[in-house]
């Protein structure tokens, strides 16, 4: 009986997705997010550099933090919904 129970526990663990899946916002609205695909382990937020209010113009998942440009400043983080 114990062997059957142990087997069922092992099968359950193997069948579950135990990998960490990061969730990032992907629109300007802060309550909409998506689960990032495998390999994308950062969330990013882009804001306009010259605009006084720092509204995000782009959000999403990334494998590397995008580089700042003349117009956009990127901020990256690695926890759920941190962008």
From Swiss-Prot:
Disulfide-linked positions: 24-43, 36-61, 65-76, 77-82
GO cellular component terms, A-Z: extracellular region; membrane; other organism cell membrane
Signal peptide, first to last residue: 1-21
Tissue specificity annotation: Expressed by the venom gland.
Domain of life: Eukaryota
One matching Pfam family: Toxin_cobra-type
Main location: secreted
Compartments in which it is found: Secreted; Target cell membrane
InterPro entries: Cytotoxin_Cobra, Snake_3FTx, Snake_toxin-like_sf, Snake_toxin_con_site, Toxin_cobra-type
One MF annotation (Gene Ontology) recorded for this entry: toxin activity
Keyword Disulfide bond: yes
Keyword terms, alphabetized: Disulfide bond, Membrane, Secreted, Signal, Target cell membrane, Target membrane, Toxin
The family this protein is said to belong to: Belongs to the three-finger toxin family. Short-chain subfamily. Orphan group XV sub-subfamily.
Free-text function comment from the UniProt entry: Non-cytotoxic protein that does not show lytic and hemolytic activities, but can induce aggregation and fusion of sphingomyelin vesicles. It binds to integrin alpha-V/beta-3 (ITGAV/ITGB3) with high affinity, and it inhibits osteoclast differentiation and bone resorption in mice, probably due to binding to integrin alpha-V/beta-3.
Record-given protein name: Cytotoxin A5
């Amino acid at each position: 009986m114990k062997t059957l129970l142990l087997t069922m526990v092992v099968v359950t663990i193997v069948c579950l997705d135990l990998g960490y899946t990061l969730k990032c916002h992907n629109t300007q609205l802060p309550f909409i997010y998506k689960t990032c695909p495998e390999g994308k382990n950062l969330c990013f937020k882009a804001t306009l550099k010259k605009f006084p209010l720092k509204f995000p113009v782009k959000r999403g998942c990334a494998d590397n933090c995008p580089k700042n440009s003349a117009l956009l400043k990127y901020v990256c983080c690695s926890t759920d919904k941190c962008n």
